[in-house]
Each structure stands twice: as structure tokens, then as C-alpha cells.
Amino acid sequence: MKKEYLKFSKEIKAIIIIILILTLIFGFNDNKPEFILKNWLLNLLYVFILVSMIILFNTLGYKLVAKYLGAEIEIKALNSHVFKDKFRLFKLYKYVFTPVLPVLITLFSNGKFFFTPVGTFDIKDYNIFGRKFPKITYFNHGLIATGGLFFNFILMLIFKSAGLDKGILISSWFIIWQLWPFSNLPGAKIFLASRALYIFSLIFFIGNILLIQSLPVIYAIILSLLVSIILAVIYFYFLEYLKA
């Protein structure tokens, strides 16, 4: 019981850290001609609310898909020790591709460049009774990652219908960087699960992000879905199926 509580507490801390860092990234520059502390703080609060919704939706998506597949996920901030062997000099591993780097980029760019890969998730395998595989597979990992991003996409559509441009902006950059196939990011989990699934996810999400700016939502979804399916099928058939 105590172990589960500590794990839950650790996950809550990670979620709070991720929310605070992303709030700073997207709220640091309020794009006003002059700095007024009151307005800056109000904008920061507004961004905090939007970011909290995005992270909670993302977490909910991961957990629901994981539960369906018989697994449990834990939200984590990117771990600097993953890069300890590659960046030993001056302990650079503490600053390279960890939550520290996005903050530094925000400060040096005056909040005009959004570098958001600060969080990810880990999965603990469980037996899946009644299913073909006794353990969670890499493909299941990819499905969980895709599910979390799909929940973010749904929230982005809600922001679109509500006319919340800031919410669309934050959601877009969050999804884009989560799709990056690097380290332990969700994009890497999808990429390792299936190249075809990764191509589908990449084209579908980024296609929608670009198209909903100029097309009705339903047209953007249909067009992105068709293109992503076609490209994923072409890749799978010519580069995997024929070479198998």
C-alpha cells in the first residue's frame, strides 16, 4: 500500500513539474508591446489552465488505452541520466534533452521558440488474460502513445470550436514534439512499435494541425485521414511486406 502511494505521489509530482515547465514555455512571452506585471500574470494563469487541461487529457488517454490493454502507465519527466554516458563532460547530461533544456531555450529565445519534450510515460507489463500475447508488446506501447495524442487532438478540436487560439497553439506544439522519435518520448514508442503506425500518426496529426487553420474541421480530418492511410499502406506494402 505504501509503495503504491509513493508511486502515485511521484507521478503527481511529475505531472505538476511538466505543467509548470510548459506553462513557463508558453506563457513567458505574452506578445504585448510593453511589460505590465498584472497582464503578464493573468496571461500566465490563462496558459496554466490550458496546459493543465492538455496534460490531463494526455494522461487520461494514456491510462485508458493502457487499462484496456491490461497495463498500467506512469507519467514521468524526461530523465537526464539516460544521457549520462554520452554527455559526461561538465555533467552536460543534466541539461541535454531534459526539462532544463526547454527552459533555457525559452529564456534565450525570449519565449518565441516552443521546445516542449519534457515528459513521457513508462509502462509496467501485465498479463493479459484472454488475449493472444501474455505480455504487452511494442505495438501495444505504440497504441498507448497514439491514444494519448489522440485525446490531445480531441481537446484541440474543442479549443477550435470554442475559438481558443492559444489552446490550439499549445496543443499543436505539444503534439508535434511528442511525435519526435527520440529517447523515451511517445513518438519513439510509436516508431519502435511500427513504422507504418508512426507514418500514419505523423501525417494524421500534423496534417490536421496544418489544415484546420484553413479548412472546416470535418474536411481537415477526412483529408488527413485519407492521406495518412494511403502513405502508411504504401510504406507497409513496399518496404515491409514485399521485403519480408
Q: What do these predicted ranges mean?
A:
Residues 1-244:
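Hydrophobic transmembrane alpha-helices and their immediate loop junctions
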